[in-house]
């Protein structure tokens, strides 16, 4: 074997354009953190579901890529997007169709084996699958119509609202939560009936925020895995028996997205699509609503928030200035925020790595402020 040939080929690669090294570091880091939490906190069982979901997710994703190619489920890149994204056209999409069900199956199996199965898990499973199906319809229309536009915004919001209302009715009828919102320390604010419309807004906002974040290779899957891990650790630290099943749900979701990340990092071999991103956001919101971790989710999900707010600012300022002075003004080069940095000339992998690092910092902050 000509080792010199392979060594020279490796040296010639631009590692800044390959997200594998940092993805492996992220996976190892989350595994190490899970080991530490399991060692120092009684009843913590994060490592087994994490490792299991990473391995199974990676295997299923590799198999799924082949299946998605066979049925021609490939990404369509919008013409008005960054020019560097045209090379992503044709990449298999709808990867979330494998990851979400697998993570839910594993979560419920772990819950049954540990005698922690609960109605909360049923509600979360319903919410995740329902939002996955909405994303699936959206992705399928986009793929079959050969354009980066599936369901209309109105149709998507209506479907998300219907599912959100069903979820909220379910948790209300089963008395699975209260209307208090925990903020700093043990301070709470009771919202009473106002909690329910706010909860519905959070479901829609979070699912669409993760959807907006899914615009760079490995960005949403990495950030999502970090936030799920943070929520799992916070729930374990609380020491409430009712939260252990949800903590298992969170760490299994984290593992599933980490397994997916192996193939979703730059250069991506598969995208999660709306099928995955909507389910991810809905799951995060559902966990926060059921476990009173809304404040923590707001802090941990700072990147999701920033991406969403950047779009609101961009559209709002553009429409307002166009109405007042006849010419629309853009605050950012392009929204969501990650596209702004792309057009500034920052490499995709650098943007993703920095957004991951910011998420890690804010996850640590949220846990310390609990």
From Swiss-Prot:
Classify the main location: membrane
Return one GO MF term.
Answer: phospho-N-acetylmuramoyl-pentapeptide-transferase activity
Q: Which PROSITE patterns match?
A: MRAY_1 (PS01347), MRAY_2 (PS01348)
What is its cofactor? Mg(2+)
Record's subcellular location: Cell inner membrane
Q: List, alphabetically, the Pfam families matched.
A: Glycos_transf_4 (PF00953), MraY_sig1 (PF10555)
Q: How does it sit in the membrane?
A: Multi-pass membrane protein
Q: What residue ranges are annotated as transmembrane?
A: 21-41, 46-66, 92-112, 117-137, 151-171, 181-201, 217-237, 243-263, 270-290, 298-318, 349-369
Its domain of life reads Bacteria
What family does this chain come from, according to its entry? Belongs to the glycosyltransferase 4 family. MraY subfamily.
Q: Which PANTHER family match?
A: PHOSPHO-N-ACETYLMURAMOYL-PENTAPEPTIDE-TRANSFERASE, PHOSPHO-N-ACETYLMURAMOYL-PENTAPEPTIDE-TRANSFERASE HOMOLOG
User: What's the protein called, per UniProt?
Assistant: Phospho-N-acetylmuramoyl-pentapeptide-transferase
Query: In the record, what lineage is assigned to the organism producing the protein?
Result: Bacteria, Bacillati, Cyanobacteriota, Cyanophyceae, Synechococcales
Q: Which gene encodes it?
A: mraY
């Amino acid at each position: 074997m000509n080792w010199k040939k392979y060594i020279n080929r490796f040296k010639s690669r631009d590692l800044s354009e390959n997200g594998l090294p940092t993805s492996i570091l992220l996976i190892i880091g989350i595994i190490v953190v899970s080991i530490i939490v399991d060692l120092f906190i009684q009843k913590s069982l994060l490592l087994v579901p994490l490792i299991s979901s990473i391995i199974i997710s990676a295997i299923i994703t590799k198999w799924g890529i082949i299946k998605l190619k066979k049925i021609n489920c490939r990404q369509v890149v919008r013409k008005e997007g960054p020019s560097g994204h045209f090379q992503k056209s044709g990449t298999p999409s709808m990867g979330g169709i494998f990851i979400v069900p697998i993570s839910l199956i594993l979560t419920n199996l772990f819950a049954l084996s540990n005698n922690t199965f609960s109605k909360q898990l049923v509600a979360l499973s319903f919410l995740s699958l329902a939002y996955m199906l909405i994303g699936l319809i959206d992705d399928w229309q986009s793929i079959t119509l050969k354009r980066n536009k599936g369901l209309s915004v109105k149709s998507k919001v209506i479907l998300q609202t219907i599912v959100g209302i069903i979820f909220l009715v379910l948790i209300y009828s089963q008395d699975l939560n209260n209307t208090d919102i925990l903020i700093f320390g043990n301070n709470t604010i009771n919202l009473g009936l106002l909690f329910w419309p706010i909860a519905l807004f959070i479901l829609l906002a979070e699912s669409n925020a993760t959807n907006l974040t899914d615009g760079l290779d490995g960005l949403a899957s990495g950030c999502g895995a970090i936030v799920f891990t943070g929520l799992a650790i916070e729930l374990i630290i609380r020491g409430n028996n009712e939260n252990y099943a949800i903590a298992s749900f969170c760490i299994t979701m984290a593992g599933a997205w980490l397994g997916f990340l192996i193939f979703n990092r730059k250069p991506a071999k598969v995208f999660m699509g709306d099928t995955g991103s909507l389910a991810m956001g809905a799951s995060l919101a559902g966990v926060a609503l059921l476990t009173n971790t809304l404040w923590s989710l707001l802090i941990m999900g700072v990147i999701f928030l920033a991406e969403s707010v950047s779009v609101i600012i961009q559209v709002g300022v553009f429409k307002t200035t166009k109405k007042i002075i006849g010419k629309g003004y853009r605050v950012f080069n392009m929204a969501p925020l990650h596209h702004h940095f792309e057009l500034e000339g920052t490499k995709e992998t650098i943007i993703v790595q920095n957004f991951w690092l910011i998420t890690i910092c804010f996850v640590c902050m949220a846990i310390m402020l609990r």
